[in-house]
Design a protein with these regions (language model features):
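ABC transporter nucleotide-binding domains
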Residues: 2-201, 207
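ATP/adenylate-binding site constellation spanning eukaryotic-like Ser/Thr protein kinases
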Residues: 62, 72, 90, 202, ...
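Conserved NTP-handling cores and scaffolds of large molecular machines
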Residues: 101, 238, 293-297
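ABC transporter nucleotide-binding domain
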Residues: 166-254
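C-terminal coupling/interaction segments
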Residues: 255-305
């Protein structure tokens, strides 16, 4: 299990991660999504002890990373495949990792076969394509037969066949009781792979839960002949929205606080006529992601523009 509680980090007094709490259960794959600069990588680095949080805690199997006697046996991680020594061979890279983890080096041959780079095992990592380095990085994460995996953009450089292979590997790992936390910018791949989802925007979690629940009618479309008045009413009620198709506004309903009944009440209280109020038809994770991470609470004038 991987958990964080109110993780917070600032650089030069600028917050980059704000009170991030998440829980990744054994037997599940959790997708960690956010735009570039949203705080994903910093959060992952805090979980594995590479960055010290200003506040908050992170644990893996009930312990902080620095308290784990042999971390590689508990959690495997791939944060930057390009960081591997370019002058070593693939086999040498894994052999060193196995020895550091106090693992039988015979496991190296199994992992080379598992990730599909046995034929290139004697080649220097510096000659590997990005996809091959990603495969090697995944093998390195698995060296200690860990209970959890933390992967930052593991599909980078993989071709469609490689992505399908990775999906199968992670699903098998989770089905055997492992915990997987992965970040990715490939939304369709996260939708095909993950069971749970955590979305971060501007350093803060904006949605978390089972993927199928979050995708089920996660937004509400509302429209009025007077979009400026409608936007002002939502703004006054502290309800975030983004401009939708035409003059419609789209409201995030994934958290359960905002419902169609609530929106109808806001319109009634502000004497705004509504001509449309409906759950939107989800177009999958892409629509959900952009509705959650788009600029929130725009001014009424911006919404009407």
């Amino acid at each position: 299990m991987i958990t964080t509680n109110a993780l917070t980090k600032s650089y030069n007094q600028v917050p980059v991660v704000r009170d991030v709490s998440l829980r990744c259960e054994p037997g599940t794959i959790t997708g960690f999504l956010g735009a570039n600069g949203a705080g994903k990588s910093t959060t992952l680095k805090m979980i594995v002890g590479l960055v010290r949080p200003d506040r908050g805690t992170a644990t893996i199997e009930g312990r902080s990373f620095v308290e784990l006697p042999n971390p590689t046996r508990v959690v495997g991680m791939l944060l930057d495949a390009s960081a591997m020594h370019p002058g070593r061979s693939g086999r040498s890279t894994l052999t060193i990792a196995a020895r550091m983890a106090d693992v039988d080096t015979r496991r190296v041959e199994y992992l080379l076969d598992l990730v599909g780079i046995a034929d290139a095992a004697e080649k220097r990592v510096g000659t590997y394509s990005l996809g091959m380095r990603q495969r090697l990085g995944i093998a390195q994460a698995l060296v200690g037969a860990p209970q959890a995996l933390i992967l930052d953009e593991p599909a980078n450089g993989l071709d469609p066949e490689g992505i399908a292979w990775m999906r199968t590997l992670l699903r098998d790992f989770a089905d055997h009781g492992g915990t997987v936390l992965l970040s990715s910018h490939l939304l369709h791949e996260v939708q095909a792979t993950a069971d749970h989802l955590v979305v971060i925007s501007d350093g803060a979690v904006v949605a978390a839960g089972r993927l199928d629940h979050l995708l089920a009618s996660s937004t509400i479309v509302v429209r009025s002949p007077d979009p400026v008045a409608l936007a002002a009413a939502l703004h006054a009620a502290r309800i975030d929205y983004v401009a939708g198709p035409g003059d419609a506004l789209t409201v995030d309903a994934s958290g359960g606080r905002v419902t169609a009944e609530v929106l109808a009440g806001v319109a009634r209280d502000h004497q705004v006529l509504l001509t449309e109020l409906r759950q939107s038809e989800t177009n999958g994770l892409e629509q959900l992601f952009f509705s959650l991470t788009a600029a929130k609470a725009a001014s009424p004038q911006e919404a009407a523009a």
